[in-house]
Amino acid sequence: TSEGAFRGYKQKIPPFYGSGYSKNGGYYSQDDIRELILYAKKLNIEIMPEVDLPAHSWTLLQVMPELKDEVSNVVSEDVGSYKNNTINPSLEKTKYFLNDILNEISNLFPFKYFHVGLDERPKNSWEGSPTIIEFMKQNNIKSQEDYQNYYINYVINILKLRDKTTAVW
């Protein structure tokens, strides 16, 4: 994934794949991905999937705005000039989405490693979120960085259940 595009077909979410900078759009169907994996295996190449979260999610949030905090008054901007591009991992809908997408992509890719991004989250992206603030209080999490550590451990545990090793930037 990237700000402007989601190039992998996802069965259970609205169609936003093929969006982005390419004038022709485009995406990889699950059959395309399976074919690419077979070709890579013939060449002894492993393909590492990447779902770049929690930031870099502008395109995703255009079709699934429920994954962000609707009442946050913070305007965050990342290095790519996209505003408010970060999902809110404290929301139940976001947790469901994370489990679902990581499971679906893990099932497609038989290789050991799975990349989850984790770079360039705007520093203030979560500080105005009432749900994150409440979650931090309830779980004795002291800072945004500690909350991000909670998030990455949550993702690592999802992927461990699928026998994947997590990679980050």
Give the ranges of each region predicted by the language model.
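Feature activates predominantly on carbohydrate-active enzymes
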Residues: 1-113
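Gly/Pro-rich turn-and-neighbor structural signature
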Residues: 95, 99-169
